């Protein structure tokens, strides 16, 4: 990549992030009145959750649509799809079949399909379900108002699944905070082409948002009371955000480590997270950020997928189990008590019992706190879909159960070890278990429930952990130093 990588520069060279807030941003403002209802059904990852929120923002600003939980009362219904799991397409068409009745009696409901299944299927969705009005990809959600208008004017279904680089971020309304924690997408796509994965084909190659654009969005959210920023990307630690290209100068590039350092300088931001990472891109610069930036949460999600080098090679992951463990050792040298979660695929084509035992050995060596683990799901069009898969389903399910039981037991022991400790918790709102209590998350992503005044929502508090439950912690606020 041309230009100077910012990771080679000191953090002091970064722009003053707090000064970015007053900069004008050419984005549509919210309408003065509600002109209709919008229903969105979201499947899949946090990127899809983020995209769905942006769809709502775009349609609120341009069409005056207000979100509803009831598709029956909606004027526009959208499904934001995920294609990671098997039979994803069939699930989408089942959903669409249920929505077909919404048009009964001639009601002018707009039905749209977005996300990764839309990218994969395109026109085929309309051919199979001609009552679908819109098909759009993750990179064209900002064009929803234009697509809706074109559908109404022409009477024809509209399909736009192109990959227009990073254009959508220039066309989105200003971000709206919905609580003390917010997601910020910093890049799109993936260029790793793992043999089992559809993401490069559905979301395109890696494209990073410009450095200053990300900082503007974070500053806007901080001004609205956001205290925790979650940086998003399919391969978020491959971030290379251009900056400094004015007057024909060669652009420089900020890596994720420097982006984190700069966000930490923005007033009000007390915690930073990021997901999802790829071990190949887990650099020394990022390890240094964990060492130097206290706002960077004491938690890392780093998908390893398998512990067998033979299977990792077949997956085209680009690293060995030893190299993965080496990165973890470097990280724990600067954050000894960091919690690490991961992704695992069990039963990848050709996985033997010996391969699986190597995965279990890696799990034991690293001590993962949490996992997202699944039996291998064949995705059409990926290289792995051509591999012979002769492991019985019962064997795969037994391996998965054993893997999950091991990690869950370790996670329970970590939770138990937290009893008696004081944890810094961002208060998110009332507890779902007991609305008279508050809830928030610890640094290592554990829900913590505790008595407290609702006025603390949006603040960090120190909570003494008194009990470890199966999926959460209980505690009480430390009165001597309760808020930061």
Curated annotation (Swiss-Prot):
<dbReference type="InterPro" id="IPR002792">
    <property type="entry name" value="TRAM_dom"/>
</dbReference>
<keyword id="KW-0408">Iron</keyword>
<feature type="binding site">
    <location>
        <position position="197"/>
    </location>
    <ligand>
        <name>[4Fe-4S] cluster 2</name>
    </ligand>
</feature>
<dbReference type="Pfam" id="PF00919">
    <property type="entry name" value="UPF0004"/>
</dbReference>
<feature type="binding site">
    <location>
        <position position="194"/>
    </location>
    <ligand>
        <name>[4Fe-4S] cluster 2</name>
    </ligand>
</feature>
<keyword id="KW-0949">S-adenosyl-L-methionine</keyword>
<feature type="binding site">
    <location>
        <position position="82"/>
    </location>
    <ligand>
        <name>[4Fe-4S] cluster 1</name>
    </ligand>
</feature>
<dbReference type="Pfam" id="PF04055">
    <property type="entry name" value="Radical_SAM"/>
</dbReference>
<dbReference type="GO" id="GO:0005829">
    <property type="term" value="C:cytosol"/>
</dbReference>
<keyword id="KW-0004">4Fe-4S</keyword>
<dbReference type="InterPro" id="IPR023404">
    <property type="entry name" value="rSAM_horseshoe"/>
</dbReference>
<feature type="domain" description="MTTase N-terminal">
    <location>
        <begin position="36"/>
        <end position="153"/>
    </location>
</feature>
<comment type="similarity">
    <text>Belongs to the methylthiotransferase family. MiaB subfamily.</text>
</comment>
<feature type="region of interest" description="Disordered">
    <location>
        <begin position="428"/>
        <end position="450"/>
    </location>
</feature>
<dbReference type="GO" id="GO:0046872">
    <property type="term" value="F:metal ion binding"/>
</dbReference>
<dbReference type="InterPro" id="IPR020612">
    <property type="entry name" value="Methylthiotransferase_CS"/>
</dbReference>
<feature type="binding site">
    <location>
        <position position="45"/>
    </location>
    <ligand>
        <name>[4Fe-4S] cluster 1</name>
    </ligand>
</feature>
<keyword id="KW-0819">tRNA processing</keyword>
<dbReference type="InterPro" id="IPR038135">
    <property type="entry name" value="Methylthiotransferase_N_sf"/>
</dbReference>
<dbReference type="GO" id="GO:0051539">
    <property type="term" value="F:4 iron, 4 sulfur cluster binding"/>
</dbReference>
<comment type="subunit">
    <text>Monomer.</text>
</comment>
<feature type="domain" description="TRAM">
    <location>
        <begin position="416"/>
        <end position="479"/>
    </location>
</feature>
<keyword id="KW-0808">Transferase</keyword>
<protein>
    <recommendedName>
        <fullName>tRNA-2-methylthio-N(6)-dimethylallyladenosine synthase</fullName>
        <ecNumber>2.8.4.3</ecNumber>
    </recommendedName>
</protein>
<feature type="domain" description="Radical SAM core">
    <location>
        <begin position="176"/>
        <end position="415"/>
    </location>
</feature>
<comment type="function">
    <text>Catalyzes the methylthiolation of N6-(dimethylallyl)adenosine (i(6)A), leading to the formation of 2-methylthio-N6-(dimethylallyl)adenosine (ms(2)i(6)A) at position 37 in tRNAs that read codons beginning with uridine.</text>
</comment>
<dbReference type="InterPro" id="IPR005839">
    <property type="entry name" value="Methylthiotransferase"/>
</dbReference>
<keyword id="KW-0963">Cytoplasm</keyword>
<dbReference type="InterPro" id="IPR006638">
    <property type="entry name" value="Elp3/MiaA/NifB-like_rSAM"/>
</dbReference>
<dbReference type="InterPro" id="IPR006463">
    <property type="entry name" value="MiaB_methiolase"/>
</dbReference>
<keyword id="KW-0411">Iron-sulfur</keyword>
<feature type="binding site">
    <location>
        <position position="190"/>
    </location>
    <ligand>
        <name>[4Fe-4S] cluster 2</name>
    </ligand>
</feature>
<dbReference type="Pfam" id="PF01938">
    <property type="entry name" value="TRAM"/>
</dbReference>
<dbReference type="InterPro" id="IPR007197">
    <property type="entry name" value="rSAM"/>
</dbReference>
<feature type="binding site">
    <location>
        <position position="116"/>
    </location>
    <ligand>
        <name>[4Fe-4S] cluster 1</name>
    </ligand>
</feature>
<dbReference type="GO" id="GO:0035597">
    <property type="term" value="F:N6-isopentenyladenosine methylthiotransferase activity"/>
</dbReference>
<dbReference type="InterPro" id="IPR013848">
    <property type="entry name" value="Methylthiotransferase_N"/>
</dbReference>
<keyword id="KW-0479">Metal-binding</keyword>
């Amino acid at each position: 990549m041309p230009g100077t990588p910012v990771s080679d520069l000191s953090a002091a060279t970064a722009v003053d992030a707090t000064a970015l807030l007053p900069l004008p941003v050419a984005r549509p403002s919210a309408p003065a009145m509600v002109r209709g209802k919008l229903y969105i059904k979201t499947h899949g990852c946090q990127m899809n959750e983020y995209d769905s929120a942006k769809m709502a923002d775009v349609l609120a600003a341009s069409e005056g649509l207000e979100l509803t939980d009831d598709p029956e009362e909606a004027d526009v219904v959208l499904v934001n799809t995920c294609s990671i799991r098997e039979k994803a397409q069939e699930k989408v068409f089942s959903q669409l079949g249920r929505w077909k009745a919404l048009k009964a009696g001639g009601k002018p409901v707009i039905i749209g399909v977005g996300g990764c299944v839309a990218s994969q299927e395109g026109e085929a969705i309309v051919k199979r379900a001609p009552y679908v009005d819109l098909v759009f990809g993750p990179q064209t959600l900002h064009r929803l108002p234009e697509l809706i208008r074109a559908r109404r004017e022409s009477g024809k279904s509209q399909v736009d699944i192109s990959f227009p680089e990073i254009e959508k971020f220039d066309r989105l309304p200003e971000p709206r905070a919905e609580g003390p924690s917010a997601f910020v997408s910093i890049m799109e796509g993936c260029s790793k082409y793992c043999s089992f994965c559809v993401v490069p084909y559905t979301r395109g190659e890696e494209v990073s948002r410009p450095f200053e654009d990300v900082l503007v969005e974070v500053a806007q959210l901080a001004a609205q009371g956001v205290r925790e920023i979650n940086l998003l990307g399919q391969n978020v630690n491959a971030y290379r955000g251009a900056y400094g290209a004015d007057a024909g100068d060669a652009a420089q590039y900020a890596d994720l480590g420097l982006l984190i350092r700069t966000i930490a300088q923005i007033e009000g931001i007390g915690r930073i997270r990021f997901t999802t990472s790829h071990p190949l891109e887990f650099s020394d610069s990022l390890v240094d950020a964990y060492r130097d930036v206290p706002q960077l949460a004491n938690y890392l999600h780093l998908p390893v997928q398998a512990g067998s080098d033979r299977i990792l090679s077949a997956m085209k992951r680009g690293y060995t189990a030893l190299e993965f463990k080496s990165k973890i050792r470097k990280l724990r040298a600067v954050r000894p008590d960091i919690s690490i979660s991961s992704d695992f695929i069990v039963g990848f084509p050709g996985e033997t019992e010996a391969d699986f035992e190597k995965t279990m050995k890696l799990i034991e060596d690293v001590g993962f706190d949490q996992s997202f683990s699944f039996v291998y799901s064949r995705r059409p069009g990926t290289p792995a879909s051509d591999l012979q898969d002769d492991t019985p389903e019962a064997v795969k399910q037994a391996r998965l159960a054993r893997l999950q039981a091991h990690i869950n037991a370790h996670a329970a022991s970590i939770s138990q070890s937290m009893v008696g400790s004081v944890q810094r918790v961002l208060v998110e709102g009332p507890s779902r278990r007991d609305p008279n209590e508050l809830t928030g998350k610890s640094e290592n992503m554990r829900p913590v429930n505790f008595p407290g005044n609702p006025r603390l929502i949006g603040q960090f508090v120190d909570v003494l952990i008194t009990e470890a439950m199966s999926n959460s912690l209980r505690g009480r606020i430390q009165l001597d130093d309760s808020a930061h």
